[in-house]
Amino acid sequence: MAGAVLAGFAVVPVANAQPPKFPDVDSYPAVDLAEYQVIGAHPSMSGWVFSTPGGLRCQSNMIADLGVSCTGPIVGAATDMNSVAVSLTKPGLIARYEQSPDDHSYPLLPTGSKIAPGNGVVCAVLADDALTCRAKKPDSWPKDTQDPPDRHYGEHGFVVQPSGSWSY
């Protein structure tokens, strides 16, 4: 699911300077996860899907390392950017992604709400045309959880908004 989406990104450099104040995603009310959950044959094919009023279609994976990816109009970015993603192990990425049409229906995440499935990823719809997602170690993990030898856990995120989309 999200892992497959992340594999097809065309890398486009985006400046990742010290981010402006990141929105407080924790202050938004959470939706009922059951309405957004999808179950696949493997945990990497399972997670949560949602759409935004601004036309983004997002997939958050059950496996915390895989994070969340969204496709659709990335307002506030270069005109050909159509994808944004972030995970526990990789900084946010705004990119152009060659994609085949997806005719699946994704439930709407309403403006002023968040989806917080407990996998370390939290996304909130700030306004009809603005989305933010943050990925960090899940609260359920012990504080002393060690990084795997091949990657580093950290806090990463992105903001998609008309005044300028950015990631860290």
What feature does the model see in each segment?
Residues M1-Q18:
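Secretory targeting and sorting signals
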Residues P13-N16, L33-V49, P53-G55:
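Long, hydrophobic N-terminal alpha-helical segment
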Residues Q18-G40, A64-T111, R151-Y168:
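A low-complexity, Ser/Thr/Gly/Pro-enriched, surface-exposed linker/loop concept
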Residues M45-A77:
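Short, surface-exposed binding/anchoring microloops in extracellular/periplasmic proteins
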Residues S100-W141:
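Acidic, glycine-rich flexible loop segments
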Residues A127-Y168:
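Extracellularly exposed regions in secreted/surface proteins, prominently low-complexity, repeat-rich
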